[in-house]
Amino acid sequence: MSIHEFSARLINGEEKALSDYKDQVLLIVNTASKCGLTPQYEELQILYETYKDQGFTVLGFPSNQFMNQEPGDHNEIAAFCERNYGVSFPIFEKVKVNGKEAHPLFQYLTSQQGGLFTEKIKWNFTKFLIDRSGNVVKRYAPSTSPIKIKDDIEELL
């Protein structure tokens, strides 16, 4: 099994098969607009712009599960990301990342790379690095600066 077997709805409502990202290195991130870590969008965009021509993509999945820090609707989220951080990488519709109602992709991601003490995602901006075959290679804590992941991305490109 790999992440290529899942699909998710883009922020514009279009269903997107993750198999469309075969042969790409991915960084999948649960995001929020009203979090102290929200400025990480800037570094995520820098990584995307730096490596997109080499087969790298960031996939952002907004979630409101942590202290209601993503209260906006899909249009508000898309506008916020573009206006404040110039985000041009794919942003998906808001999802749940923990619990029985967690999106199947996040159930899979956490089963493949658990966190410290638990599989659960503890906060916004948890990051999962995916290789070109769709395998979950590494999980990064919310506090990990996206730029610090650069060497790991380059190894997979």
Swiss-Prot record:
UniProt keyword annotations, A-Z: Oxidoreductase, Peroxidase
Catalytic residues (UniProt): 35
Source domain of life: Bacteria
One Gene Ontology term from the biological process aspect of the record: cellular response to oxidative stress
Family matches, as InterPro entries: Glutathione_peroxidase, GPX_AS, GPX_CS, Thioredoxin-like_sf
PROSITE patterns assigned: GLUTATHIONE_PEROXID_1, GLUTATHIONE_PEROXID_2, GLUTATHIONE_PEROXID_3
CDD domains, sorted: GSH_Peroxidase
GO terms assigned for molecular function: peroxidase activity
EC numbers on record: 1.-.-.-
Record-given protein name: Glutathione peroxidase homolog BsaA
Native source organism of the sequence: Halalkalibacterium halodurans (strain ATCC BAA-125 / DSM 18197 / FERM 7344 / JCM 9153 / C-125) (Bacillus halodurans)
Phylogenetic classification of the source organism: Bacteria, Bacillati, Bacillota, Bacilli, Bacillales
PANTHER family, alphabetized: GLUTATHIONE PEROXIDASE (PTHR11592:SF78)
Gene name as annotated: bsaA
